[in-house]
């Protein structure tokens, strides 16, 4: 996480846009790959992380303007979790690190929101978040987008569009890792290899920095096909190899660089 004052100031600035009501910001949960306990790598919602900083699943942030308080709702670690995962810092401790004094179990959120007016939230891209919010707010999930706060969406976009020095440094870190991904491809590409062999080398680079890739790597000799995620072709001399890739840093900032390279073997 960044310095706690960063998150305090971001929340304060967002709150200044509204005179009453409350702001609800959804974090992400795990997404199952083929069963509940086998999941895709966890990626926290960028807006939740921007204001609350915690890279953990199942959290919801509340900025309550009427009551002048800030809360994180979630399910803290149980003894069963500790047996499986080892000793962990409790989520209520992480909340304090971003200057949130109140951490409340997630099951209490619906009661907290009862009879409240001006509950502001943004559009959601994950179905489980749509269904959860629809349930606790008693709205039709098929009409979810009719209930979002466009004033909140605009305020968040306006604030997040302006990058401070700390964010620029984090973006540069992600771009530098992305640079290594491209340089590795340039050094290791050779005629006769499969595209997926080069993809494996490219995607290895961010893992060396506790990073991930910011989107599915596009690497293809058939660059005329937009967003080609197949990597089964054999590379040959004279191919124009397209690489579009990026790194997602451990602080949640991304790189995204695109290039084409002529494959030309040189005898030494």
List where the protein language model places each region:
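Acidic/histidine-enriched ion/cofactor-binding microenvironments in catalytic or ligand-binding pockets
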Residues: 53-55, 64-65, 224-253, 264
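Active-site pocket-lining segments that scaffold enzyme catalytic pockets across diverse folds
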Residues: 163-187, 193-210
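Short, basic/aromatic beta-hairpin or loop at an interaction surface
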Residues: 36-37, 209-223
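Conserved small/polar residues in nucleotide/adenosyl-binding loops
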Residues: 257-261
